[in-house]
Design a protein with these regions (language model features):
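N-terminal auxiliary segments of SAM/dcSAM-dependent transferases
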Residues: 1-75
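Generic hydrophobic alpha-helical segments
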Residues: 10, 101, 105-108, 229, ...
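An acidic site on a long C-lobe helix of protein kinase domains
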Residues: 54, 94-97, 225
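A general structural signal marking secondary-structure boundaries and capping sites
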Residues: 34, 38, 65, 69, ...
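SAM-dependent Rossmann-like transferase core, predominantly class I methyltransferases
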Residues: 45-46, 60-139, 144, 149-159, ...
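Generic alpha-helical secondary structure signal
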Residues: 5, 29, 97-100, 130, ...
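Short, Lys/Arg-enriched, disordered terminal segments
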Residues: 1-17, 52-53, 60, 107-120, ...
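S-adenosylmethionine
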Residues: 141-142, 147-282
């Protein structure tokens, strides 16, 4: 099979799942992954025969994509904030909104850094570790801890930290049943915020392939994590300490109200105009 023949096969097989533009992008991604050919070379060598091993692997990838499996899981990695991060079925695939959360935190932390030299930061529900590792890159002198209930998720997080050569204190714990013992300057979190009653609205490709424990609240209360974060923050944030949260866009006002006792709290929209973040300052 030539490269051009595979391209036609790939698009035909995935036509019911992806638009032509999406399948073209995926084709280029996976062909580059297997052959090393960039987009120009893919066109230039369109009539070149694929190695049998590459052809077999690409056909297997096509079959996996047809099941709805996210392409990032098939690749085994994705991009976040311009950097490569490993992912698998035990962690959520990073969304663009979480990049916005990190950007928001980065701007506010830069202002706080003039007052505090060695920041202490806690990430709750770290998953693949994208948030603490990215912030460590920007604030190398900070002391960062990251908590998750899943041992397998933390294995991926540690793999990412090792890959980026960043020291993060990973903690396996159930946050909802854990008493914090230290104080922090920053608490940041993108916790499970989808209510059980919203389950039918979630795409099958998400429900079927990404960890439900990272998506859905463990109870009917979609705000359960935010309530504990608000309570813990009152006790475990240092003076001028800040909280950054990614939230359920349908529960913006309700989430913001949890931080009414803080000196400052704001509901912030994402680039799509949805209520997506809450910022609070002690």
């Amino acid at each position: 099979m030539t490269i051009l023949e595979f391209k036609r096969y790939f698009k035909s097989e995935l036509s019911e799942l992806y638009t032509e533009a999406e399948s073209a992008q995926l084709y280029s991604i996976f062909l580059y992954e297997k052959t090393g050919f960039d987009r120009f070379q893919q066109r230039r060598f369109a009539h070149q025969e694929l190695l049998i091993s590459d052809e077999e692997e690409l056909q297997e990838i096509t079959s996996e994509l047809k099941t709805g499996k996210p392409y990032q899981q098939i690749l085994g990695h994705t991009e976040f904030y311009g950097k490569k991060f490993f992912v698998d079925e035990n962690v959520l695939i990073p969304r663009p909104e979480t990049e916005e959360l990190v950007e928001l935190a980065k701007i506010e932390i830069q202002n706080l850094k003039s007052k505090i030299q060695n920041l202490k930061l806690l990430d709750i529900g770290t998953g693949s570790g994208i948030i603490p590792i990215t912030l460590k890159k920007h604030f190398p002198n900070s002391e960062i801890s990251a908590m998750d209930i899943s041992e397998k998720a933390l294995e991926i997080a540690q793999k990412n930290a090792d890959f980026h050569k960043k020291e993060i204190n990973f903690i396996q714990a159930d946050f909802l049943n854990t008493e914090l013992t230290e104080k922090y300057d920053i608490i940041i979190s993108n916790p499970p915020y989808i209510g059980i009653d919203e389950n039918p609205e979630i795409e099958d490709s998400v429900k079927g392939f990404e960890p439900n424990i990272a998506l859905f609240s463990p109870t009917s209360d979609a705000l359960i994590f935010y309530k504990k974060i608000a309570k813990d923050g009152e006790k475990h944030l240092n003076e001028n300490g800040m909280i950054f949260l990614e939230i359920n866009q349908k529960l913006g006002k309700e989430t913001l109200e949890l931080f009414s006792n803080y000196s400052e709290s704001r509901l912030i929209k994402d680039l799509s105009g949805n209520d997506r973040f809450v910022f609070a300052k002690k």
